[in-house]
């Protein structure tokens, strides 16, 4: 009877440096203005939101001055006091989003951002309803600023509320100069672990150490000769005759290699650059904006062919179908 206290000999891919890169991707850096300047979407939305807030600020100051209590016989015009709270709240909201984007931590705080944006949208729309029909120019200008800010807020809610793999967001991020080295690290963290040897836990609390390298999600059975020292299935051990080992089994020719298909009916564009794992001969490298031919779009890894005829598998969330 074998002991359950032995060590496990993991495949070499378990200690792959790419897994360390996936873990280190959560260690956020400081504020980098390049994340704002190099991202057209972030630069445009933060600029418009800041301009809208400035319009609201000056409109609120003059609108509060122009309010009338009706003592002089003029119509009663009262400034809504909660608009001051909305003004201050949106200031910290815009500042917080600016810091989050500049520090490249949107995926860490995106849930909180969407919640705060929803609160800001309610306050902005309520202020619009109370100011736009006042008949006072300063209050109407304030309402116009809130309308512009509400439009940006709705866009932000859609952007931060969508997954990085969503087609609209992936298309927007493809124009950013800095997302190439930051977004895939987080977005591919779980799939990179699956590819490098960590998939779902089994009944013994351990992990299946075989990467998914088939383009269609199906892969041939693999034979392992490393000793697991106690992680084997006892039920299967009783069915194996004595003297029988994996060394006596003839290994199929070309095991681990994927036969490339002959038809590639799909075309996809790379939204990020990808460097193939040197330990996996089935992967291919490609650069950002490169167009690949795809044979099958099912599964996490697609069988692809480059323009130079090189074939292999590519991660699906680095590509967008054309």
From Swiss-Prot:
Region span, Disordered? 1-20, 191-261
- What are the GO cellular component annotations? plasma membrane
Subcellular location(s) of the protein: Cell membrane
Stretches assigned to the Cytoplasmic side: 1-40, 103-107, 162-322
Name the Pfam families on file: SH3_1 (PF00018)
Those parts of the protein on the Extracellular side are: 62-81, 129-140
Does the keyword field hold Transport?
no
Instruction: Please classify the protein's predominant subcellular localization into one broad category.
Output: membrane
What positions does the domain SH3 occupy? 263-322
Q: Does the keyword Cell cycle apply?
A: no
Q: Which keywords belong to this entry?
A: Cell membrane, Membrane, SH3 domain, Stress response, Transmembrane, Transmembrane helix
**Where does this protein have compositionally biased stretches of type Polar residues?**
1-16, 191-250
Note the SUPFAM superfamilies from the entry: SH3-domain (SSF50044)
GO biological process: one example:
regulation of actin filament polymerization
Q: Where are the transmembrane segments?
A: 41-61, 82-102, 108-128, 141-161
- InterPro entries in alphabetical order: SH3-like_dom_sf, SH3_domain, Sho1_SH3
**Topological relation to the membrane, as annotated:** Multi-pass membrane protein
Tell me which family the UniProt entry assigns to this protein.
Belongs to the SHO1 family.
| Complex and partners | Forms homooligomers.
Function of this protein? Plasma membrane osmosensor that activates the high osmolarity glycerol (HOG) MAPK signaling pathway in response to high osmolarity.
Report the protein name in the record.
High osmolarity signaling protein sho1
**Record gene name:** sho1
